[in-house]
Design a protein with these regions (language model features):
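H-loop/switch region of ABC-family ATPase nucleotide-binding domains
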Residues: 118-119
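A short, surface-exposed alpha-helical micro-motif characterized by mixed small hydrophobic
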Residues: 124-126
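Catalytic Walker B motif of ABC-type/P-loop ATPase nucleotide-binding domains
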Residues: 83-86
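Conserved ABC ATPase signature
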Residues: 58-62, 66
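Conserved ABC ATPase "signature" region
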Residues: 39-54
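Helix N-cap at the start of a conserved alpha-helix in ABC-type nucleotide-binding domains
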Residues: 94-95
Length: 168
């Protein structure tokens, strides 16, 4: 994994603060970083995440899933090289989780690299190609997702997978 600190990075958190203004106004804040963003760009980003009907709704009153989609719209506007997603579907219902995962897959089709954290093993299998398994703040294992799940190499990874798979 290579990353240049000069690259454009978008951050999508599962608890992102919103200003007490419309969803559209929250996206307009991206103009402070990139003045080339137009009203049409904002409208397109809202449409891409399915929030065009809620553009004038107060962002702080949107549901958790709608707020997450708004965060993804913000990332779309930034045209980043790298998107960091922290637990992108935490606390979302299954339908909204599926919608957000589809949006993440669309990002994956762009030139942006995606790096996401997740404790949801099924989501990791659906979305990731490569895994860094971290235990107590230390990378214990890294490599393609398939082999990690089929044949974990470290005791920590084996223990975690056994606990999680039994719990699921």
């Amino acid at each position: 994994i290579q990353f240049s600190f000069g690259s454009k990075t978008a951050l999508v958190l599962h608890h992102t603060p919103m200003i007490k203004a419309s969803a559209r106004a929250n996206l307009s804040l991206v103009r402070e970083v990139d003045a080339s963003i137009t009203d049409q760009d904002i409208d397109l980003a809202l449409k891409q995440v399915g929030l065009n009907e809620l553009a004038q709704s107060p962002a702080h009153k949107l549901s958790a899933g709608e707020r997450q989609k708004l965060c993804l719209a913000r990332a779309i506007l930034q045209k980043p090289n790298l998107v960091l997603l922290d637990e992108p579907t935490a606390n979302l219902d299954p339908n909204t989780t599926e919608q957000v995962e589809e949006m993440i897959r669309q990002f994956d089709q762009s030139d942006a690299d995606l790096l996401f954290s997740s404790h949801q093993l099924a989501q990791v299998q659906r979305l990731a190609e490569y895994i860094l398994f971290i235990d107590h703040g230390e990378i214990k294992e890294k490599g393609p997702v398939g082999p990690f799940f089929l044949n974990p190499q470290t005791a920590a990874a084996k223990r975690y997978l056994q606990q999680e798979l039994i719990a699921e």
